[in-house]
Amino acid sequence: DTKISYPEINSGAKQTEALAAGSLDICSALGGTSAILAASNGVDLKIVGIYSRAPKAFTIMAKDPNITTVSDLTGKKVAGPKGTILHQILVAALAKNNLKPYSVELLSMDIPPSVNAMLNGNVDAALVAGSDVLRAQKAGAHIIISGEGLVDATIVIAARGDLVKNNPDILKRYLSAHRKNIDYMNQEQAKAYDFTAQATGLAPEDVVTMAPWYDFDPEI
């Protein structure tokens, strides 16, 4: 039997640090941008599958009603995690509006504190993804733009190169279990939504709202 532990690490940078240190074997949901940055910095990781593609789930948000377009962000403070899909969306959105990355002041912080900083008025906008989008909307913030049409927003499944090379059977078993999970989600949608709500603490209606944002096809 194989003993499995499942640490909850939400930061892409911390996931790849754990891979590099050998304390983590598989990242079940790693931002594609984080994977590329880690590999370019010498981390021995291999992309073995796709967790999701979800451009609608990654957004730039503001609470100030006067900030409604990307151009309105010029000279403003934006909070969010650097070196991530969200950062990539910000740069792409600015470029699409003929603006440079330095047109805004990006303050690097994780998503929940970024949302809090925006809601408290400490920054003008925030890079927000997943359930935090709904949290921010319920607190009066609005979406300026999502990643749709800008990036694929691909979340990958990545593994340590050593695991791929020396323990391929373990990886095959993991990917088989992942595919079975996807099949269950598709076949038993109501049960899958209920389980997700219980596991995450999200309201059932929020799970239903967010589900269409994600494409969980695991094929690369």
Predicted regions and their residues:
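Stable alpha-helical elements in mature extracytoplasmic
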Residues: 15, 34, 69, 86, ...
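Short, glycine-/small- and polar/acidic-enriched structural segments
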Residues: 1-100, 105-110, 124-130, 142-151
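A bilobed periplasmic-binding-protein/Venus flytrap-type ligand-binding module shared by bacterial periplasmic
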Residues: 58-67, 154-169
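Aromatic-anchored, glycine/proline-accented short structural segments
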Residues: 140-144, 157-159
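Short helix- or helix-capping micro-motifs
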Residues: 136
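Secondary-structure end/capping motifs
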Residues: 166-220
